[in-house]
A protein has these predicted regions:
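NAD-dependent ADP-ribosyltransferases
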Residues: 1-2, 46
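Sec-dependent N-terminal signal peptides of Gram-positive bacterial secreted proteins and lipoproteins
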Residues: 3-27
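Mature, Sec-exported extracytoplasmic domains of Gram-positive
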Residues: 30-50, 54, 78-80, 93-97, ...
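Aromatic-lined substrate-binding rim segments of carbohydrate-active enzymes
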Residues: 64-121, 128-136, 171, 175-180, ...
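Extracellular glycoside hydrolase catalytic/binding regions
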Residues: 33-34, 62, 132-136, 140-150, ...
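N-terminal carbohydrate-binding accessory modules
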Residues: 26-79, 308-315, 322-325
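Membrane-insertive, amphipathic helical modules of secreted toxins and fusogens
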Residues: 2-5, 10, 71-73, 79
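Short beta-strands and strand-loop turn motifs
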Residues: 51, 81-85, 113-117, 152-153, ...
């Protein structure tokens, strides 16, 4: 072996350190929070994370936070999806209130999925952009919480069943969030009020590619169209998963306006296929939709539907596992 000069040795050592540290850097960054890899969501400890949880209409019932969140936690839920408002449709949830929500959810050992509800069903980009601007305005609550807070950019933005226009919107929205320094895992709801999964199948990969962090999960809301029967549930899940994309069912019920929903199939296939799900919603649905209430009040007893979601063979109590940070 040829003798190495001192300068050469230093150069070699420096090169080796660069290789070692450089290869470790992406892994360390990913481990600071939730991340997507190979079409699956992982928590900051490197464990696959399957959401088993409940939606809570916080923005409409702001005073119930300290009652509702502990009650939801008692079901065994590992995640709670929180309705927030940017002030365009409902009463705004400001920075300090969001910080408090995160603290309460965290104290109850659940992951907080935060969503802006004001853009629901709207097709104009301004509504989506308003949601993005809201997240940027409260980013102090999000940055540093990547291991316990996930951002669902806008609830059911793009009501029309048009995948191309839906994708165009998110391909602008996601880079804007990332450029602002928000690195949390993002969730994007399907077009068609969340019930048009073909939008994800056709355009989800291009939306995912627009994320510099490659840390986006897609969400189907399964009601009377996307979740009407077992065959539909199964194919809708498989069609997205076959594209190599991470998927959750961000909302579902047991029934909806125009027909039945197979909540049993959603939970069963969610377990079999590793798809997270979040049932809609804890309580407080309007008259005529109160069959969607899981409980009779913020600390109320479970309804029949709630009992199914919590206690069924494939329900929360039998399938939920807490995130590794807890």
């Amino acid at each position: 072996m040829a003798k190495l000069q001192k300068g050469t040795i230093v150069t070699v050592i420096a090169a080796l350190m660069f290789v070692i540290l450089g290869s470790a850097a992406p892994k360390a960054a990913a481990a600071s929070g939730f991340y997507v890899n190979g079409g699956k969501l992982y928590d900051s400890t490197g464990k696959p994370f399957y959401m088993r949880g409940i939606n809570h209409g916080h923005s409409w019932f702001k005073n119930d936070l300290n009652t509702a969140i502990p009650a939801i936690a008692k079901t065994g839920a590992n995640t709670v999806r929180i309705v927030l408002s940017n002030g365009t449709q409902y009463t705004k949830d400001d920075l300090n209130s969001v910080k408090n929500i995160i603290n309460v959810v965290n104290a109850n050992k659940m992951i907080a999925v935060l969503e802006v509800h004001d853009a629901t069903g709207k097709d104009d980009y301004n509504s989506l952009d308003a949601a993005v601007n809201y997240w940027i305005s409260i980013k102090e609550a999000l940055i540093g919480k990547e291991d316990r807070v996930i951002v669902n950019i806008a609830n059911e933005w793009y009501g029309t069943w048009n995948g191309s226009a839906w994708a165009d919107g998110y391909k602008k929205a996601i880079p804007k969030l990332r450029d602002a320094g928000i690195k949390n895992t993002l969730i994007v709801d399907a077009a068609g009020w969340g019930q048009y999964p073909q939008s994800i199948v056709d355009y989800g990969q291009s939306v995912f590619a627009a994320d510099s962090q490659k840390n986006t999960v897609f969400s189907i809301h399964m009601y009377e169209y996307a979740g009407k029967d077992a065959a539909t549930v199964k194919s809708n899940m498989e069609n997205v998963l076959n594209k190599g994309l991470a998927l959750i069912i961000g909302e579902f019920g047991g029934y909806h306006t125009n027909g039945d929903v197979d909540e049993y199939a959603i939970m069963k296939y969610g377990q079999e296929k590793g798809v997270g799900w979040l049932a809609w919603s804890w309580y407080g649905n309007s008259s005529g939709l109160n069959y969607l209430d899981l409980a009779t009040g913020p600390n109320g007893s479970l309804t029949s539907y709630g009992n199914t979601v919590v206690n069924d063979t494939y329900g929360i109590k039998n399938t939920s596992q807490k995130a590794g940070i807890f």
